[in-house]
Amino acid sequence: MRLFLSLPVLVVVLAMVLEGPAPAQAAPEISSTLERIPDKLKEFGNTLEDKTRAAIESIKQSDIPAKTRNWFSETFKKVKEQLKTAFS
Protein backbone atom coordinates (compact mmCIF):
# COMPACT_ATOMS: atom_id res chain seq x y z
CA MET A 1 0.00 0.00 0.00
CA ARG A 2 2.80 2.41 0.88
CA LEU A 3 4.61 1.66 -2.37
CA PHE A 4 1.38 2.11 -4.29
CA LEU A 5 0.99 5.64 -2.85
CA SER A 6 4.62 6.68 -3.00
CA LEU A 7 5.18 5.91 -6.70
CA PRO A 8 2.74 8.59 -8.00
CA VAL A 9 4.20 11.11 -5.58
CA LEU A 10 7.69 10.27 -6.80
CA VAL A 11 6.60 10.68 -10.44
CA VAL A 12 5.05 14.11 -9.72
CA VAL A 13 8.15 15.31 -7.87
CA LEU A 14 10.42 14.05 -10.63
CA ALA A 15 8.31 15.85 -13.26
CA MET A 16 8.50 19.09 -11.27
CA VAL A 17 12.27 18.83 -10.92
CA LEU A 18 12.85 18.04 -14.59
CA GLU A 19 10.57 20.88 -15.68
CA GLY A 20 13.01 23.47 -14.34
CA PRO A 21 12.34 26.86 -12.81
CA ALA A 22 9.45 29.00 -13.96
CA PRO A 23 10.38 32.25 -15.74
CA ALA A 24 9.48 34.26 -12.64
CA GLN A 25 11.77 32.05 -10.55
CA ALA A 26 14.73 32.39 -12.88
CA ALA A 27 17.83 33.80 -11.25
CA PRO A 28 18.26 37.56 -11.75
CA GLU A 29 21.46 38.94 -13.18
CA ILE A 30 24.42 39.14 -10.84
CA SER A 31 24.95 42.85 -11.45
CA SER A 32 21.41 43.74 -10.36
CA THR A 33 21.80 41.52 -7.31
CA LEU A 34 25.08 43.21 -6.38
CA GLU A 35 23.50 46.65 -6.82
CA ARG A 36 20.74 45.77 -4.35
CA ILE A 37 23.08 44.51 -1.61
CA PRO A 38 23.77 47.93 0.02
CA ASP A 39 20.06 48.74 0.13
CA LYS A 40 19.23 45.36 1.64
CA LEU A 41 21.99 45.75 4.25
CA LYS A 42 20.75 49.22 5.17
CA GLU A 43 17.18 47.95 5.45
CA PHE A 44 18.36 45.05 7.61
CA GLY A 45 20.33 47.42 9.84
CA ASN A 46 17.37 49.76 10.27
CA THR A 47 15.04 46.89 11.08
CA LEU A 48 17.51 45.45 13.58
CA GLU A 49 17.98 48.86 15.18
CA ASP A 50 14.23 49.41 15.52
CA LYS A 51 13.66 45.97 17.04
CA THR A 52 16.57 46.40 19.45
CA ARG A 53 15.34 49.81 20.59
CA ALA A 54 11.83 48.44 21.10
CA ALA A 55 13.17 45.50 23.14
CA ILE A 56 15.30 47.78 25.33
CA GLU A 57 12.38 50.15 25.92
CA SER A 58 10.13 47.24 26.81
CA ILE A 59 12.72 45.98 29.32
CA LYS A 60 13.15 49.46 30.81
CA GLN A 61 9.41 49.87 31.30
CA SER A 62 8.84 46.44 32.78
CA ASP A 63 9.35 45.71 36.46
CA ILE A 64 11.55 42.67 35.84
CA PRO A 65 14.87 44.51 36.41
CA ALA A 66 13.65 45.94 39.73
CA LYS A 67 12.32 42.56 40.88
CA THR A 68 15.56 40.86 39.88
CA ARG A 69 17.66 43.46 41.67
CA ASN A 70 15.53 43.13 44.82
CA TRP A 71 15.71 39.34 44.72
CA PHE A 72 19.51 39.41 44.44
CA SER A 73 19.75 41.94 47.29
CA GLU A 74 17.51 39.88 49.57
CA THR A 75 19.32 36.64 48.72
CA PHE A 76 22.71 38.27 49.33
CA LYS A 77 21.52 39.59 52.72
CA LYS A 78 20.24 36.15 53.71
CA VAL A 79 23.51 34.47 52.75
CA LYS A 80 25.48 37.16 54.56
CA GLU A 81 23.42 36.66 57.75
CA GLN A 82 23.78 32.89 57.55
CA LEU A 83 27.54 33.22 57.20
CA LYS A 84 27.67 35.61 60.17
CA THR A 85 25.75 33.20 62.38
CA ALA A 86 27.74 30.20 61.16
CA PHE A 87 31.15 31.76 61.84
CA SER A 88 30.31 33.74 64.98
From Swiss-Prot:
<keyword id="KW-0850">VLDL</keyword>
<dbReference type="InterPro" id="IPR043081">
    <property type="entry name" value="ApoC-1_sf"/>
</dbReference>
<dbReference type="GO" id="GO:0005504">
    <property type="term" value="F:fatty acid binding"/>
</dbReference>
<dbReference type="GO" id="GO:0006869">
    <property type="term" value="P:lipid transport"/>
</dbReference>
<protein>
    <recommendedName>
        <fullName>Apolipoprotein C-I</fullName>
    </recommendedName>
</protein>
<feature type="signal peptide">
    <location>
        <begin position="1"/>
        <end position="26"/>
    </location>
</feature>
<dbReference type="GO" id="GO:0004859">
    <property type="term" value="F:phospholipase inhibitor activity"/>
</dbReference>
<dbReference type="InterPro" id="IPR006781">
    <property type="entry name" value="ApoC-I"/>
</dbReference>
<dbReference type="GO" id="GO:0050995">
    <property type="term" value="P:negative regulation of lipid catabolic process"/>
</dbReference>
<dbReference type="GO" id="GO:0034364">
    <property type="term" value="C:high-density lipoprotein particle"/>
</dbReference>
<dbReference type="GO" id="GO:0034447">
    <property type="term" value="P:very-low-density lipoprotein particle clearance"/>
</dbReference>
<dbReference type="Pfam" id="PF04691">
    <property type="entry name" value="ApoC-I"/>
</dbReference>
<dbReference type="GO" id="GO:0042157">
    <property type="term" value="P:lipoprotein metabolic process"/>
</dbReference>
<keyword id="KW-0732">Signal</keyword>
<comment type="similarity">
    <text>Belongs to the apolipoprotein C1 family.</text>
</comment>
<keyword id="KW-0445">Lipid transport</keyword>
<keyword id="KW-0964">Secreted</keyword>
<dbReference type="GO" id="GO:0034361">
    <property type="term" value="C:very-low-density lipoprotein particle"/>
</dbReference>
<comment type="function">
    <text>Inhibitor of lipoprotein binding to the low density lipoprotein (LDL) receptor, LDL receptor-related protein, and very low density lipoprotein (VLDL) receptor. Associates with high density lipoproteins (HDL) and the triacylglycerol-rich lipoproteins in the plasma and makes up about 10% of the protein of the VLDL and 2% of that of HDL. Appears to interfere directly with fatty acid uptake and is also the major plasma inhibitor of cholesteryl ester transfer protein (CETP). Binds free fatty acids and reduces their intracellular esterification.</text>
</comment>
<dbReference type="GO" id="GO:0032375">
    <property type="term" value="P:negative regulation of cholesterol transport"/>
</dbReference>
<keyword id="KW-0813">Transport</keyword>
<dbReference type="GO" id="GO:0010916">
    <property type="term" value="P:negative regulation of very-low-density lipoprotein particle clearance"/>
</dbReference>
<dbReference type="GO" id="GO:0006641">
    <property type="term" value="P:triglyceride metabolic process"/>
</dbReference>
